[in-house]
């Protein structure tokens, strides 16, 4: 049972066949998609507004051929480092596949597949779905044809969701329990870290000892829900632009420009320039980002040539990110990578309300030399 009183929460549960009771001043639910509080209170989850319904299969593998040894004729030039040393995301029809090599050898790999594009295999086992994907994509099969699964592959029947409610008077869910979008850009990490940071700033011993609702919970929950919504909008737009790839690549720059600006501003001690994740706490910047995402989706649906669509999308992204593009991103670039170059930070110091000297000092402070 779950009983909320004015000054505490009482939990009743069974552990190892024994009935136990726990009294807590407050509860922070960090249990992920199987939210314990949601199960206790019967809180329902809802589908996402923008990201298509999807499912996932995944596992850990040994004897995976590195991507550098696979066919790379689609690339214009040699990559700057072995691709398999990064978290590699392969876009496929109706989804994407990840491949993440650990330092000691094994590879974490899996696929996110939309219900609409893969309805015919959704009810199959994880292993059958995985083999189907490999058969459909020879370059992936080339990497995994000798691979051995370390443990039975697993399957998530429904990936994206958001809870109808994420807080009560004395309990709150971390963003990881309140909702999940898609691991495409690993946005779950900053969403949850933001939630932890806000809770850490708001909760004090005297706050927990007092009676009645914890006043900070509604505001924290509202901010987390807003960030979940903009992530959903972003990922949904990326799914809509996966084909052709250059539309997708250009659209990702909305994300990379925003988060690199935020990271730099925060390291400069100027958090007010980029409050929240993806400008979630700045209504003007947030609205600009959302408007760009809407326009991109509209263009993607137009009955025009891919070249015309790409030019329109690139123009929107270029103008949208101009005020916060401090790392030299170019939506019209034909190569799929940008160097780890600090010089754009100096050129764009004014966008960060800073001087080149302040940029230099910040880089030295964090162990980066230029």
PLM segments and residue spans:
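A general structural signal for short secondary-structure boundary/capping elements
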Residues: 73-78, 144-145, 156-158, 219, ...
